[in-house]
């Protein structure tokens, strides 16, 4: 396993730990999720390029589309919660139920 894969794996683990530690604020959770998606995207892209998997070349693009959708939904939820309650605490998400 090369140093690049080790660094990307550590970046994923650090983002996961950040998600577990800073789960009270929505903005911190979204940033940690984006870090996880970015490290997964780079890891999948490097694996496909180094092993010459031509059939799986669409996997990073699909992952990027899901990451963009997740970011858009997360930011819209963040704006809605911060405009409604003035803070970005995750506990305010329980109050959004109809």
Curated annotation (Swiss-Prot):
Superkingdom, natural source: Eukaryota
One Gene Ontology cellular component: mitochondrial inner membrane
Sorted UniProt keywords: Electron transport, Membrane, Mitochondrion, Mitochondrion inner membrane, NAD, Respiratory chain, Translocase, Transmembrane, Transmembrane helix, Transport, Ubiquinone
One GO term of the biological process aspect: ATP synthesis coupled electron transport
InterPro entries linked: NADH_UbQ_OxRdtase_chain4L/K, NUOK/Mnh_C1-like
Catalytic activity from the UniProt record: a ubiquinone + NADH + 5 H(+)(in) = a ubiquinol + NAD(+) + 4 H(+)(out)
Tagged with keyword Transmembrane helix: yes
Cysteine disulfide links: none
Membrane topology (UniProt): Multi-pass membrane protein
E.C. no: 7.1.1.2
Transmembrane segments: 1-21, 29-49, 61-81
PANTHER family: NADH-UBIQUINONE OXIDOREDUCTASE CHAIN 4L, NADH-UBIQUINONE OXIDOREDUCTASE SUBUNIT ND4L
Primary role: Core subunit of the mitochondrial membrane respiratory chain NADH dehydrogenase (Complex I) which catalyzes electron transfer from NADH through the respiratory chain, using ubiquinone as an electron acceptor. Part of the enzyme membrane arm which is embedded in the lipid bilayer and involved in proton translocation.
Subunit description: Core subunit of respiratory chain NADH dehydrogenase (Complex I) which is composed of 45 different subunits.
Family to which the UniProt record says this protein belongs: Belongs to the complex I subunit 4L family.
Protein name: NADH-ubiquinone oxidoreductase chain 4L
Taxonomic source organism: Mephitis mephitis
Lineage of source species: Eukaryota, Metazoa, Chordata, Craniata, Vertebrata
Protein encoded by which gene: MT-ND4L
């Amino acid at each position: 396993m090369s140093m690049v894969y080790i660094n990307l794996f550590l970046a994923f683990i650090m983002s996961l730990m950040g998600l577990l530690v800073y789960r009270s604020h929505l903005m911190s959770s979204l940033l940690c999720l984006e870090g996880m998606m970015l490290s997964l995207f780079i890891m999948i892209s490097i694996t496909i390029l180094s092993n010459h998997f031509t059939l799986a070349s669409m996997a990073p693009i699909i992952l990027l589309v899901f990451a963009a959708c997740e970011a858009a939904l997360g930011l819209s939820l963040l704006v809605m919660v911060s405009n409604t309650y003035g803070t970005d605490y995750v506990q305010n998400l329980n109050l959004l139920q109809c």
